[in-house]
């Protein structure tokens, strides 16, 4: 945004910490899935599904169209098992094909609807405020960590060696570090 872009897309490589970080910096969190990839409704996806404002099943074309529609129905059904979003938005589930360029417009419509919903109800601005607070605290943590490690590097290395040599337990080493 600072560079003047109105739309910024952020892609992550999988399920993990990166998605949590990305969720704290975006207006709409879109989960892109593939039908038949073996991860439909797995427990590992639960956390990321709860964060999603929308789920799109891509590659809904050719022989994969029917499995994609089936996955769409499964995800729609599964979303009812999760707690509702605090902003009242009900996550949408769609299918699309980047290859055949089908239903991409519907994907943009879902993003637009979610954005409009949150803006009209004041959640857009409050989410931005919460994101700013989150990043402020992240920056504090990073700065404190950097400062602490640089000031105690030698002591940490010595205690670390004692832990590795089983002369101290990790908790004992921690107590010594903070004396």
Where are these regions (language model features)?
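Long, well-ordered amphipathic alpha-helical subdomains in the mid-to-C-terminal portions
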Residues: 95, 106-179
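Canonical P-loop GTPase G-domain recognition
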Residues: 54, 60-121
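Conserved ATPase-coupling elements of RecA-like P-loop NTPase cores
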Residues: 15-22, 40-43, 67-68
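Short, high-confidence coil segments that cap the C-terminus of an alpha-helix
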Residues: 5-6
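Residues on a specific face of well-ordered alpha-helices
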Residues: 24, 43-46, 50, 69, ...
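Walker B catalytic acidic pair
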Residues: 12, 59
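Inter-motif core of Ras-like GTPase G domains
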Residues: 2, 18-36, 46-56
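Short, acidic/turn-prone active-site loops that include or flank metal/cofactor-
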Residues: 34-39, 61-62
């Amino acid at each position: 945004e600072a560079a003047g872009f109105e739309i910024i897309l952020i892609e992550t490589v999988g399920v993990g910490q990166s998605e949590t970080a990305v969720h704290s910096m975006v207006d709409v969190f879109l989960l892109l899935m593939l039908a038949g990839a073996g991860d439909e409704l797995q427990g590992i996806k639960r956390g990321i599904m709860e964060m999603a404002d929308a789920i799109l099943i891509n590659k809904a074309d050719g022989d994969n169209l029917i499995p994609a529609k089936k996955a769409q129905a499964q995800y729609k059904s599964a979303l009812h098992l999760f707690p509702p979003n605090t902003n009242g938005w009900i996550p949408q589930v769609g299918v699309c094909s980047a290859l055949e360029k089908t239903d991409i417009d519907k994907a943009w419509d879902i993003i637009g609807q979610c954005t409009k919903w949150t803006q009209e109800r004041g959640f857009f601005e409050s989410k931005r405020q919460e994101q700013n607070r989150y990043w402020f605290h992240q920056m504090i943590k990073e700065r404190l960590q950097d400062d602490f490690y640089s000031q105690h590097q030698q002591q940490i290395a010595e205690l670390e060696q004692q832990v590795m040599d089983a002369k101290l337990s990790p908790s004992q080493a921690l107590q010594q570090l903070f004396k």
